[in-house]
Each structure stands twice: as structure tokens, then as C-alpha cells.
Amino acid sequence: MQILLLALTIGLAYAHQTLDPSEINGQWHTISIAADNVEKIGEGGPLRGYFHNLHCYDGCKNIGLTFYVKLDGNCQRFDVLGAKQEDSDVYVAQYSGTNHFEVIGKKEDAIAFYNHNTDETGKETKMIVVVARRDSLTEEEQQKLQEVAGEKGIPKDNIRYFRERDTCAQ
């Protein structure tokens, strides 16, 4: 039920399927981030990532993520590799702690990820990150994202929409 609702709410065609590298590989940018710990995604927060590239390896058993985080006003590049867990659609990656993430929706020009981060101190953060090859979500997608975020325990006030692209690595 939740998967069906998610497909409808974010407006992305979702199905448990093998990811196709031709659909994933290439340039993407962050258009929305939501988290239950809003300080983690605020300006200068360690989980406020500005995505630039996704790449599948080994038939998408591994996903490479290239993103930038602005720390102390400076852009820092991160190249992170997520390894798919056996018998699961969940990937595990190390960045600002341990991350368990999965694709919860995708279509040609947008991908939504759900991420569960446990930082080095043990603090847990639930997140939704939407990356795209377009500049924004539609109003309907924004409204539905708020509903899904609420179901994941993320207050709608903690959703950040990126109206413009980041200035890192231009």
C-alpha cells in the first residue's frame, strides 16, 4: 500500500525492478531534500548534498554518487559508492556515518531516494532526496511529497525545495 501511495504521491513510476544503468548514469541535481533532523539538511549541514552525478556499476549492484556539500562556505566534493545488499533493494554507503538508501521512485527525469543515516555519534536521520534532470517538482508532486514525508516521520516544514541549482563545481 505504501509503495502504491508513494508512486502516486511523488508522481514517479515505481516498481521493484532492476535499475537500468542507461536510465541512471549521468548528470543529476538535487531539487528537494527532507529530513526529520532539519539541522542536518540546513545551510552548512552535512546531509545537504548538491548532487551532480550518478553512475551504476556491475549492473547497478553498486551506485556511485558524486555530490558537493557546502561546509563553512566552501564546496567539498564527495564521491561515495553505495553497495546493494543481497536480497534487497537497499544500498549501504559511508558518508557522515552509515547510510542505508533505496530508490523509492523514478522516471526519466527524476529519482527519489529514501535514506536512513546513522552518524558517528549514533544519531539517526530519516531523509528523502529527490534528484532530477529538471529544475523543480510540480505543485502536485510537492503536495504529495509532503504526505509521504509525513508517513516517514518527516514534518512537512522540514522539506527544502531547491529553486536554483547549486554553485559548486561550475
Swiss-Prot record:
Posttranslational mods: Not N-linked glycosylated.
Disulfide bond keyword on record: yes
Tissue specificity comment: Expressed in submaxillary gland (at protein level).
Top-rank lineage group of the source organism: Eukaryota
Gene Ontology cellular-component annotations: extracellular space
Signal sequence, start to end: 1-15
Pfam family, one: Lipocalin
Classification via SUPFAM superfamilies: Lipocalins
Database matches in InterPro entries: Calycin, Lipocalin, Lipocalin_CS, Lipocln_cytosolic_FA-bd_dom, OBP-like
GO function terms (MF aspect): odorant binding; small molecule binding
Keywords: Allergen, Disulfide bond, Secreted, Signal
Location(s) in or outside the cell: Secreted
Keyword Acyltransferase: no
Record Gene3D superfamilies: 2.40.128.20
Cysteine disulfide partners in this protein: C56-C60, C75-C168
Family, similarity comment: Belongs to the calycin superfamily. Lipocalin family.
Name of this chain's protein: Lipocalin Cav p 3.0101
